[in-house]
Amino acid sequence: MVKEKPNSTRIYDQDGFRRRAACICVRNESEKEVLLVTSSRRPDQWIVPGGGVEPEEEPSATAIREVAEEAGVIGKLGRCLGVFENHDRKHRTQVYVLIVTEELPDWEDSRNMGRQRKWFTMEEALKQLRLHKPVQLVYLESLLTATNDKATL
């Protein structure tokens, strides 16, 4: 299902959940540092970059587009961590890992709304999301679980 909004077209799945995609942006394959961006609604809060899937767009393409727009980074898309539901907002977000290869000095959301980006240690990122965006905390916890599973193989 597709709904037109003044500033975007929103795509919904068969259950009425809005389809979204996001990336946990990491500096390298060790995945010890995570890039967060300031919220467009609350600039004092740090969140995971992501947004709505557009018509005829694959979630992986959405994830890459959204991190370029919101965080001003380009990178290598890695594994999908899964699809996470937010029942309060009726969203389903497909979350990927992105290894950042380039940080743009100037990007769309920094120009248009003063959005900032910042590297956090995994521990600091967990703390920020716990405080400001608990619904996204499961994204990082999933990354940690996958990383720990990989380390024990």
Predicted features and spans:
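Acidic, metal-coordinating catalytic segment for phosphate/diphosphate chemistry
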Residues: 1-22
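Short, well-ordered beta-strand micro-motif
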Residues: 25, 38, 97-99
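Entry beta-strands of beta-propeller and related beta-repeat scaffolds
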Residues: 32-34
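Short connector loops/turns at beta-strand edges and beta->alpha or beta->beta junctions
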Residues: 40-43
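A short gly/proline-enriched turn/hairpin at secondary-structure junctions
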Residues: 47-50
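Unchanged
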Residues: 53-139
